[in-house]
Amino acid sequence: REVLRSAAEYLTPVTLELGGKSPCIVDATAKLPLAARRIVFGKYLNCGQTCVAPDYVLCDVRIRDRLVEAIRAEISRQFGADPLQNPDYGKIINEKHFHRLLGLMDAEKTVCGGQYDEKTLRIAPTVMTDVTWEDAVMGEEIFGPILPVLTYNAHDAEKGVAQNDFCRDASGTHAATGDFVDWAIRCVEEHPHPLALYFFSEDKKAQRRILNYCHFGGGCINDTIIHLATSAMPFGGVGESGMGGYHGRAGFETFSHYRSIVDKKTWTDLPIRYQRYDEMKEKMLRRFLK
């Protein structure tokens, strides 16, 4: 906002990439081992310190335990039994950020990781469950190796959280995963538009509903962060997560000014366009403009 405010003083156009809490949605049809592998890769790359890292997981309660266990196994496979001793595992950028992240963790809700080393500014890949929107970890962009998992369950349905018209089909009924998808859409749309969104599902209708009704900068179906890696598509946010896009041709166009130029030939000229206009000219102009 400060950049935009300063640029506005000089009428300078801007492109802003502002980050945000990027959701990772996993429904009951997802291939969990593969989903876990790709979530762990995207979340813990550079210790979660990337603008498009999955910030939190929304999942169906029916698969939560299996998903969390698969994520736990993938963390061990990718980073070893003790990630803090892995020389290839990164560290938090500075002490201030390190202590901010520790303040977001809740030991009672931590089911994986939670260890840290203040001397090396390292925090182990951490997973938290039974998280609510009121928890500190959901109050800001995490930008670190902490993955909260929120679940859809019967209690949410009883409160009416999932009852909306976003995802009903032509008959007015929900698909097998419809209630969960409704809830996920509501969760995303009730918060600032994220920079990225990731959806793991084998249900094509559910995929279309998520893409049609969620506002976000960019994302992936059945993967994480790789949309950022191509120069063939623009990258950027929307709303609270930014404006404009760049990468490849889109970046060139974003930072270019297109001028409209007419190179008019001089070997002929149509006098009909010039004053004075009489009845004959008016008829000809009207016929021409049709």
Regions found by a protein language model. Name each.
Residues 1-133, 151-176, 221, 289:
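ALDH superfamily catalytic-core signature
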Residues 25, 123-290:
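Conserved C-terminal structural/oligomerization subdomain of aldehyde/semialdehyde dehydrogenase
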